[in-house]
Amino acid sequence: MATLSYAQSTDHWLKRKVVNLVELATGREKITSIYQQLKDEPFQVHQFFSRGIQLSRLSLRYNQEMEARIPRDGPLVFVANHPFGIIDGLILCEIAARIRGDFRILLNNRLMKDENLNKLFLPVDFDGTREATRKNVETKKTAQQILENGGTIIIFPS
């Protein structure tokens, strides 16, 4: 199973240590446990996110009138603002899957560690290299095309 971490083997050892400590302090073990349970089940993209919420023992309370106002077609962008870490992204993915069906997720390329989920991802590379810039331009073009075709994108700015 892929390690769920922003730390990369190419990072300076001190950065890896700090990132790992912060992740451990903010619940990486629990998230990893839930992720492992999800990976043990047959993969279905639309079930993955709702099942993740269920395994997290989250109880979602929201204004159903506001949810009803989310457009069912045409271009749409959801933005996760991260007050609760990965949880807000999980919830937005569940909402997008339920209401819109197909969607793509714009996120840090360091999170691209799951071959089943990678097909949903539009990676952003923060390495600052020419190759990163080239990849980011390609991601931007893909995102624009998705929106021009009336698709849905979730921005996961981590």
Ranges and model annotations:
Residues 86:
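Loop/helix-junction capping segments adjacent to catalytic residues or to phosphate/diphosphate-binding pockets
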Residues 1-76, 89-91, 98-100, 118-119:
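Membrane-anchoring hydrophobic helices of lipid-metabolizing enzymes
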Residues 53-58, 82, 129-134:
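Short, flexible loop segments at the rims of nucleotide/cofactor-binding pockets, characterized by
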Residues 104-136, 140-143, 147:
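Conserved nucleotide-cofactor-binding alpha/beta core module
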Residues 61-63, 79, 106, 123:
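Residues in well-ordered beta-strands of folded domains
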Residues 80-83, 93-110:
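Adenosine ribonucleotide-centric catalytic and binding domains
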Residues 74-82, 142-158:
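Conserved Motif II region of HX4D acyltransferases
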